């Protein structure tokens, strides 16, 4: 793993760091499945994407993210998952900000696709993303099971975009 940067301290005063995992990406599948419930869907982008791992100094994995190059000056945040014990403490938002700064030198736009749930839509809006478009029936057409978020069955993929320049 290559260390890319040091970060802030969390409420427990533990130092955090973000690294790029280039070898055994599949070992993070358990955490990646928190954000994308089907392993075969994750496999479609994990091998071609950059996998970022945020760790506490004691080695615990706090957060993971996968970013892909979609061509035409666009990258996509394909997966963002925060370990349950670290959720709702700002780590996901920090990771998104970090990735936006990191990729700003290579891409003009970052996209993210998500389901139509209040929690995730408001999260990405708070990170500076604005609505772009939707893909009707994405979840029902591509997943082998029903996906429910915030008590709502997901059908369409909503895409949000953020200018990085």
What do these predicted regions represent?
Residues 103-116:
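Conserved GNAT acetyl-CoA-binding A-motif
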């Amino acid at each position: 793993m290559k260390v890319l940067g040091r970060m802030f301290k969390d409420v427990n005063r533990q130092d955090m760091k973000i690294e790029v995992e280039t070898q055994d990406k599949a070992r993070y599948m358990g955490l990646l499945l928190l954000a994308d419930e089907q392993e075969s869907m994750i496999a479609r982008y994990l091998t071609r994407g950059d996998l970022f791992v945020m760790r506490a100094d004691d080695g615990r994995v706090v957060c993971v993210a996968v970013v892909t190059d979609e061509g035409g000056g666009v990258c996509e945040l394909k997966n963002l998952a925060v370990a349950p014990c670290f959720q709702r403490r700002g780590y996901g938002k920090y990771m998104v900000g970090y990735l936006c700064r990191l990729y700003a030198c290579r891409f003009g736009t970052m996209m993210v696709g998500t389901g139509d749930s209040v929690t995730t839509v408001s999260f990405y809006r708070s990170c500076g993303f604005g609505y772009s478009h939707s893909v009707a029936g994405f979840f029902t057409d591509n997943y082998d099971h029903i996906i429910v978020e915030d008590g709502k069955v997901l059908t369409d993929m909503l895409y949000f975009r953020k200018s990085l320049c």
